[in-house]
Amino acid sequence: MKSTHPAISSVAWTSFSTGVNPAKHGIFGFMERTPNTYDIYFPNSKHVMSKTVWNMLRDYNKRSVVINVPSTYPAQEMNGVLVAGFVAIDLARASYPSSIVPKLKEMGYKIDVETQLIAESKDKLLDDIFLTLEKRTQAILHFLKNEAWDLFIGVFTETDRLHHFFWDAFERNTPHFGARFLDYYKKVDDSIGKIVEGMGDDVTLILLSDHGFCELKQEIYINYWLKTEGFLSFKTSPPKSLSDIAPGSKAYCLDPGRIYLNVKGREPNGCVSPGDEYEQLRNTLIAKLMELRDPETKTTLIDKVHKCEDIYRGKFSDRAPDLVIEPKHGYDLKGAFSKDLLLSKGNFTGMHTYDDAFVYVSQKNLVKNSVEIIDVTATILASLD
């Protein structure tokens, strides 16, 4: 299954839950621009501009239980139960109705893995990944059994955390962490088995991931590249935010590879004229990005560069990035403003991929040969028809 551009959780899970592309639901990344400014904000559930599948079903008096779907925080009123996922920070605001909070606290429910534990030890982080899965499974089984539902959605985001920090252990089958990686998946398999057992008869089962994963070789800092190529400069060094962008800058990047041109009439200090200059600059950036290579290995780093109109269609197209970079597998794109190098690597050893997300549907007649994550909403609705 194909994910979204970019293949990140806020965009992919919102596309999954609404069945439309980002130009219709309004979420293009973990950070968004405030229109006509250089200010950045973190979008949440209140910024989703399309109806979710559970609210579509609400119109037909169908009840849903939604556990841990990213970008559903803060929890909104619905017909059923919702426990928000990443980037939820407060259990009370993550829960609807509020009456479920005492039960969640009683079972020791964990909103997310405490990834900062990597600074102490890998084993402590892994222990927390296992614990979070245990508590997530406990909550899912509780609501599966004790709530009435027509649609039930439960998400295990712990797999994402495991892959980001321990993909190298899996790839290399290292004795300790490689074994624990596989042990975790045995636990996932056990959890899925318990969920299937608790679903009851005549229920369509859909399993999916919002993106794929592969080994992370290097992180690419696109704003550094834009600076070295003369397309971007800042008034301060190091810059604290995008608002430090200097007059005359022609382009900038937000995570994970969204390039925005500094357009006259759109940005406060825009210098790129709409029309021919805009198109010429986009074409120049595409050509240069496609030539970008790892200085040491000489490997090309970019697979494709998409123009916004080729991948986004909808009423919020004017908020879309002008270009979206799709990297080669192994090269993760970053939008940091203060980095002074092209390539680097942090704690992550695994990265998201676009073209190999997973989907399984137990009702075979609902599946077509070419599937994108935005198709899942229609599949859910068809299964309930």
What kind of feature is each model-predicted range?
Residues F165-A169, N173-K194:
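Extended hydrophobic/aromatic segments used for targeting, binding, or gating
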Residues M1-V20, R63-V65:
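Short, structured active-site-proximal loop/turn typified by the sulfatase FGly-forming signature C/S-X-P-X-R
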Residues K186-L226, L301-C308, F316, V324-E326, ...:
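Metal-dependent active-site segment of extracytoplasmic phospho-/sulfohydrolases and closely related
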Residues V81-A84, D168-N173, E219-E229, G275, ...:
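Short secondary-structure boundary/capping segments
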Residues S50, L57, K235-V367, I373-T379:
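Active-site neighborhoods of enzymes that stabilize oxyanions during catalysis
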Residues L151-V155, I206, Y360:
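Structural motif
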Residues S9-V11, M78, Y221, L226, ...:
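Short, solvent-exposed loop/turn segments at the edges of secondary structure
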Residues V20-T174, K250-T300:
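His/Asp/Glu-rich, glycine-adjacent segments
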